[in-house]
Structures are given as structure tokens and as C-alpha cells.
Curated annotation (Swiss-Prot):
Record-given protein name: Ribonuclease pancreatic
A biological process from GO: defense response to Gram-positive bacterium
Entry's family note: Belongs to the pancreatic ribonuclease family.
Subcellular location: Secreted
Enzyme's top EC category: lyase
Keyword annotations of the record: Disulfide bond, Endonuclease, Glycoprotein, Hydrolase, Lyase, Nuclease, Secreted
Polar residues: bias regions: 14-26
């Protein structure tokens, strides 16, 4: 069975790629990572940074998660991410996504031993 940490990696990590400006990136990746099986996952974020850098967020700024739990952490540096959003009018099984690249601080929930990311909570604008 897939562990929460492995699920996080499958759904959110894409270290090898910089998500070129490829407009079909989300359509390909959402399918490849099994997020269009049985339904179209409405929103998903991929992080284009080394896994070690994302795991290190668990040692960074501790904040409260959207659901009120206290095990969320915000990255101290901005990260290169791609947001995938289901386009309006898109219906399963033809899941179509809008691809947008961003530089954001990301917020992840961590748990376990080793203490690793298990949930992508949010991304926040880099304050200038």
C-alpha cells in the first residue's frame, strides 16, 4: 500500500523537470500520476525542486494548516511550482487542466518518523 509520504511524492514532486512552458504539462502529469482515475482531481500542485529541499521544509517555519492542525510548515525559500487547475466544462474522463507556473513559498503538512511531508496545504506569494 502507498504510504502517505509516497503519495505526497507521486502527487506533488516533479524534481527532474522545470515544467517547461509546456501548456499540456498538467494534462500529461495528472494522468501519469494517476489523479484522473475515477474522477478529475480539481486542483493539484507540482513542485520542481529536489526532494531533499522539500523534505527540509518540515524543519522550517511551523504554522497552522488550513484544517486547523498544527503540523504545517512554510518553506523559507521560494520554490518553482506548477499549479494544475481543472478547466471549467471539463468532464471525466476527459480531464483538461490549465497549467500555470509560479514561484511561491509552499506550505506542507509533515508527520511520521522520519518526519516528512504528507500533504500539500497551500502556496503563498513571495513577499517582495
Amino acid at each position: 500500500k502507498e504510504s502517505p509520504a509516497m503519495k505526497f511524492e507521486r502527487q506533488h514532486m516533479d524534481s527532474g523537470s522545470t515544467s517547461s512552458s509546456n501548456p499540456t504539462y498538467c494534462n500529461q502529469m495528472m494522468k501519469r500520476r494517476n489523479m484522473t482515475q475515477g474522477w478529475c482531481k480539481p486542483v493539484n500542485t507540482f513542485v520542481h525542486e529536489p526532494l531533499a529541499d522539500v523534505q527540509a521544509i518540515c524543519l522550517q517555519k511551523n504554522i497552522t494548516c488550513k484544517n486547523g492542525q498544527s503540523n504545517c510548515y512554510q518553506s523559507s525559500s521560494s520554490m518553482h511550482i506548477t499549479d494544475c487547475r481543472l478547466t471549467s466544462g471539463s468532464k471525466y474522463p476527459n480531464c483538461a487542466y490549465q497549467t500555470s507556473q509560479k514561484e511561491r513559498h509552499i506550505i506542507v503538512a509533515c508527520e511520521g518518523n522520519p518526519y516528512v511531508p504528507v500533504h500539500f496545504d497551500a502556496s503563498v506569494e513571495v513577499s517582495t
